[in-house]
Amino acid sequence: MQLPLLFYTSVLAPAIGLAAPVAQNEALSKRENLCSLPAPPALCTPDPSVTVEETAKRAYAFYRSFVVDGDPRTMFSLIDSTYTQHHPGYASGPQNIWPLFCNGNKLGNEASTAWCFVAATNMSYARYSTTDRWRWVDGCVHEHWDQGERIPSEGCYKLPANRSQ
């Protein structure tokens, strides 16, 4: 009687342990390297019903994914298919910047960077080693500038305290 019990505990216990769910490290999953993909896995679909508050939340999520988390999947899910690039030397369209950001490298942390969304202009800003500006249309990043930009000192949208995305 004890021999089968010994068998079950020595053979089945490790197998059951392997079947248990493993907690994922969120920081590692955000820094996913997607460069094996020829294009972003998903882009933003413009939706004219997206509110100012939702756009501000999306702008914060974009800043986090681009600068702080190194999360190309989320970053590109907030860029529309007609993305216009105003940086000399770079073509417009998300597929043209995909190779620059697919690797999941982060650019800074929240303590050393800043972000702002100005509802009056539908523009968001991120400051890290440079300052970028994006125009949002129907809840999606539509245009980008990064030369001579400054983050506004006032007029930045205040997100609710929980900053849910």
Report the location of each language-model feature:
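C-terminal and inter-domain tail/linker signature
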Residues: 2-4, 15-165
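Bacterial N-terminal signal peptides
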Residues: 9-14
